[in-house]
A protein has these predicted regions:
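Glycine-rich phosphate-binding loops of nucleotide-dependent enzymes
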Residues: 1-191
Length: 191
């Protein structure tokens, strides 16, 4: 599914967003429709500054006031990025790079953000900050598709959960329902 949201080939089924089939579109066409992917391992433009990374996220907007409004929103959510605006993105810590990736996603006018493994490689305290930021983004009304192996945290955040095994959905439901399934707990959830 993630690959389908990025414009990669889907071998079986289809990916739809806002009623439109998107799995055959190019990544830039998908972004224009408001579905933004925040990739695993963050992937900032390492040689660019924090500010230039954020501005790269607003390339679809030609309105300077709109861009400034988006920057203010990103800096309100991630004040540390405002402090590091001129710093080269490749020199940021892993947690700061994750914050930058989320802030850049907000700059795209996201209607939905697909976030891939946001806690990967982060210290526990930083992980908590990142998940708080994701919750704040969701509280603004932006739906989040969260792919996360930190299952306890994912269960705390999600209204609906899907458990995948080898690319197939093997269970779905609320966190309480999935945690109550003893077979699933032992085989897939690691609980």
């Amino acid at each position: 599914m993630k690959r389908g949201t990025q414009g990669n080939i889907v071998l079986e089924g289809e990916v739809r967003f806002c009623g439109e089939r998107i799995d055959r579109l190019e990544p830039h066409q998908i972004r224009r429709r408001g579905l933004v992917h925040c990739p695993e391992r963050r992937r900032p433009f390492r040689e660019l500054s924090v500010m230039d990374n954020l501005l790269a996220g607003s390339y679809l907007s030609s309105d300077a006031a709109d861009t400034q409004s988006k920057l203010a929103r990103a800096f309100k959510l991630f004040p540390r990025l405002a402090e590091r605006g001129k710093q080269i993105a490749g020199t940021l810590s892993g947690g700061e790079q994750q914050m930058l990736a989320l802030a850049r996603a907000l700059m795209f006018e996201a209607k939905m953000i697909a976030i891939d493994e946001p806690s990967l490689g982060l210290a526990p305290r930083v992980r908590e900050d990142v998940f708080k930021a994701i919750a704040a983004i969701h509280a603004e009304g932006i739906p989040i598709l969260l792919v996360e192996q930190e299952i306890t945290q994912a269960f705390r955040m999600a209204r609906r959960n899907y458990v995948l095994s080898q690319g197939r959905i093997i269970a779905e439901g609320s966190a309480a329902d999935l945690q109550a399934d003893q077979t699933l707990r032992a085989s897939s959830l690691g609980l």
